[in-house]
Amino acid sequence: MSEVHVHRVQPAWKKNALIDNDTYLKWYADSIKNPDKFWGKHGKRIDWFKPFSKVKNTSFDGKVSIKWFEDGLTNVSYNCIDRHLKKRGDQTAIIWEGDNPYDDKKITYNELYERVCRLANVMKKHGVKKGDRVTIYMPMIPEAAYAMLACTRIGAIHSIVFGGFSPDALAGRIVDCESTFVITADEGLRGGKSIPLKENTDKAIDIAAKNFVMVKNVLVVRRTGGKVGWAPGRDLWYHDEVATVKAECKPEKMKAEDPLFILYTSGSTGKPKGVLHTTAGYLVYASMTHQYVFDYHDGDIYWCTADVGWVTGHSYIVYGPLANGATTLMFEGVPNYPSQSRFWEVIDKHKVNIFYTAPTALRALMGAGNDPVKKTSRKSLRVLGSVGEPINPEAWEWYFNVVGNGKVPIVDTWWQTETGGILITPLPGATDLKAGSATRPFFGVKPQLVDGEGKVLEGAADGNLCITDSWPGQMRTVYGDHDRFVQTYFSTYKGKYFTGDGCRRDADGYYWITGRVDDVINVSGHRMGTAEVESALVSHDKVSEAAVVGYPHDIKGQGIYSYVTLMKGEEPTEDLRKELIAHVRKEIGAIASPDKIQFAPGLPKTRSGKIMRRILRKIAEDDFSTLGDTSTLADPAVVDDLIANRQNKKG
């Protein structure tokens, strides 16, 4: 491996940092030695209606049970809004920056309180109760945050579906959690293009009805004023409804382990999993990681560029920052609209201090050269962050030297939908940085590397990343399917949470995430199960079989490479290729569009019928010199055809 460039903690980073290296080492040791005492103390960072007396009650064995602060009573929206009103009611809670650079607004904590209470009362008026599931399918507008917080105020469980997902994907998520109330907008706006959210919702509701889940009401925010279909009695205009209710709504007293939200994520088997997070442990962990990972100080302007449809938006646009009384920026647009300078212009316009984005955006912007960055000052920046996938050292150095002018620490954070918050990360005033490494575990997090047989690897090693004990932000179950939860995360290596990621630990104890080791690919920082894309392809009537693998992609990190076998008598044509791409977009959404489709007469299978994905990956990477033993294949000649017709030939 090439020489790793270490960036030592600069004196300026250390000067006002919340944590230095000695403090990190002490706190970390305490958190591992005595988790009850450590989290008992930090559990008090949120306000409780009834304090907890039990801290940790968790087991990774057998049935797997995870409970934190279980006898306490609290409320998330109270912690994100009410408790701040006395001290910072007139402070900006949310800065909203629209798709169009001239479109922005600021919402204070007082205004946030009123809007969330009104929306909570609208839901109550229409029969939404504690424990009911509410589906949110929204653009990046403040009402998306109001909807989340209003659910938490009345104890409803929200399930947010990313606005880029198709009607079919939305319907599947409505059906799985039997949601009867949906909040959406007429249209979304992204990069100057409108997205037909209400139209998609109408289609999804029809599909859900065929699966015996009847949506009673759809609350529609007017974003663009575009024309939409309307079902009187079912559909409600947001602006009409909030005008008819009171601006006060008492927060429900929620048990620490009451469900907070469900967020669907791709798995290595076809059906998306409803990751379930609960109330108190999640909020303690999201707010604590937000404070210490980003070295958040009172008054900082904080911007995470994610969408609330992903877990990063849940934890680090809404819940973490607002629980800490921060000013959080919500961005509706994309990095390159109307120009390649957009991110940096927004940073200057709103004097952003902490900026958190994804490697895929950075690689695309890096490709546009340094000029769009250099046009802006960015002098307000104090901390930079990266999330969603491992960041390659070249992109890291560009981020550090060009965006941060070599003066701003980068926190390269590793975590997952399932973990609720950041697990492995540098801390700005404490951790020497290495380009491409997530560095060290956060407090209370016990990483372990194991080999394929489950043998624990000590010291510098390369293996599968597991976590050996619970932390408060951990998911509790797969919604409606606890067996799947145990099977997916705790059966590969007994008594350990298996992350599904490969990882290398270097001689300094730093962790380097090497990517998924299961059948999940990471496209632009978003997880996509290969099985999901395969089932979408196979549902086309001309396709007999499909296999999907990831391959290295300059911008997205990983691209989607599909091998497709057609039904007898069907001809592989360019038109069919386009038709299949459109079909996948309809089934799942644009995010799952195959980058390459290779028509193949057959797939490499063992005699027992198992597809040899290892071989398909190598061919997709144009690296077939090390295909290994193909003698176990039922028909070794298939491989020659795949190599001859590969789509990624170099040179």
Swiss-Prot record:
EC number: 6.2.1.1
Keyword Nucleotide-binding: yes
Organism: Mesorhizobium japonicum (strain LMG 29417 / CECT 9101 / MAFF 303099)
Cofactor(s), by name: Mg(2+)
PTM-bearing positions, type N6-acetyllysine: K610
Post-translational modification: Acetylated. Deacetylation by the SIR2-homolog deacetylase activates the enzyme.
Residues involved in Mg(2+) binding: V538, H540, V543
UniProt-annotated binding residues for ATP: G388, E389, P390, D412, T413, W414, W415, Q416, T417, D501, R516, R527
Gene Ontology biological-process entries: acetyl-CoA biosynthetic process from acetate
PROSITE patterns, A to Z: AMP_BINDING
Functional description taken from the UniProt entry: Catalyzes the conversion of acetate into acetyl-CoA (AcCoA), an essential intermediate at the junction of anabolic and catabolic pathways. AcsA undergoes a two-step reaction. In the first half reaction, AcsA combines acetate with ATP to form acetyl-adenylate (AcAMP) intermediate. In the second half reaction, it can then transfer the acetyl group from AcAMP to the sulfhydryl group of CoA, forming the product AcCoA.
Protein name per Swiss-Prot or TrEMBL: Acetyl-coenzyme A synthetase
Residues involved in CoA binding: R190, G191, G192, K193, T312, N336, S524, R585
Family as reported in the entry's similarity comment: Belongs to the ATP-dependent AMP-binding enzyme family.
Catalytic activity entry: acetate + ATP + CoA = acetyl-CoA + AMP + diphosphate
GO cellular component term of the entry, any: cytosol
HAMAP family: Ac_CoA_synth (MF_01123)
Keywords: Acetylation, ATP-binding, Ligase, Magnesium, Metal-binding, Nucleotide-binding
Encoding gene (name): acsA
Top-level taxon of origin: Bacteria
Molecular function as annotated in GO: acetate-CoA ligase activity; AMP binding; ATP binding; metal ion binding
Residue intervals passing through the bilayer: none
Disulfide-bond pairs as recorded: none
